[in-house]
């Protein structure tokens, strides 16, 4: 049985109208109605008109948040030789080769937020699919996490690069900052994400691509947002 929302949540929800807000209106609203005592993450959720069971309708990609995410991500680099030194100098939190692969395999260790691997290590890293895959941590060339330029990849992740991927129900969930950020910074970050998702529309997708979108804080109610302006901008490019 679903738990009944608390009084604070219900009070916040009453301040949200049943309409689609412009993003510039929605962000100040979720800041106004917040009630949690901690610095919540602000998230965007987008329901897409795709069927992710078909490979040609998979939507995934990365976007660099112009204002970061308010949290320093822990980065693991799996590499060999000089690339290990390069990774350490670039600020990776954990660096290793086969030793790291063995640790993850034997301990199901996942105390990090992102994994970067050099191409020569992917034969070994491929064994880690059962541990890394379900957590969205598997390195992938499409997201820039399988690369020889480990320093650049580390810098981008530390600066706030977000990977997005549609789930099996056709929804993308992604963080765009902290509730303590200014409204302008959150609008800029959320705009970057929405634009990137629209740009990643599969060629075979038919009908309305973005079916609905909401923005919310960790504990707060969702506020529906109008993504039409972003689609218009994308079409004009």
Swiss-Prot record:
Gene3D superfamilies recorded: 3.30.190.20, 3.40.50.790
Phylogenetic classification of the source organism: Bacteria, Pseudomonadati, Acidobacteriota, Terriglobia, Bryobacterales
GO MF annotation list: rRNA binding; structural constituent of ribosome; tRNA binding
Gene Ontology annotations of biological process type: regulation of translation; translation
CDD domains per record: Ribosomal_L1 (cd00403)
Subunit-level organization: Part of the 50S ribosomal subunit.
One cellular component term from this protein's GO annotations in UniProt: large ribosomal subunit
Source species: Solibacter usitatus (strain Ellin6076)
InterPro entries: Ribosom_uL1_bac-type, Ribosomal_uL1, Ribosomal_uL1-like, Ribosomal_uL1/biogenesis, Ribosomal_uL1_3-a/b-sand, Ribosomal_uL1_CS
Pfam family, one: Ribosomal_L1
Family named by the database record: Belongs to the universal ribosomal protein uL1 family.
Residue ranges crossing the lipid bilayer per the database entry: none
UniProt protein name: Large ribosomal subunit protein uL1
NCBIfam families cross-referenced by the UniProt entry: rplA_bact
Chain's role: Binds directly to 23S rRNA. The L1 stalk is quite mobile in the ribosome, and is involved in E site tRNA release. Protein L1 is also a translational repressor protein, it controls the translation of the L11 operon by binding to its mRNA.
Keywords for this protein: Repressor, Ribonucleoprotein, Ribosomal protein, RNA-binding, rRNA-binding, Translation regulation, tRNA-binding
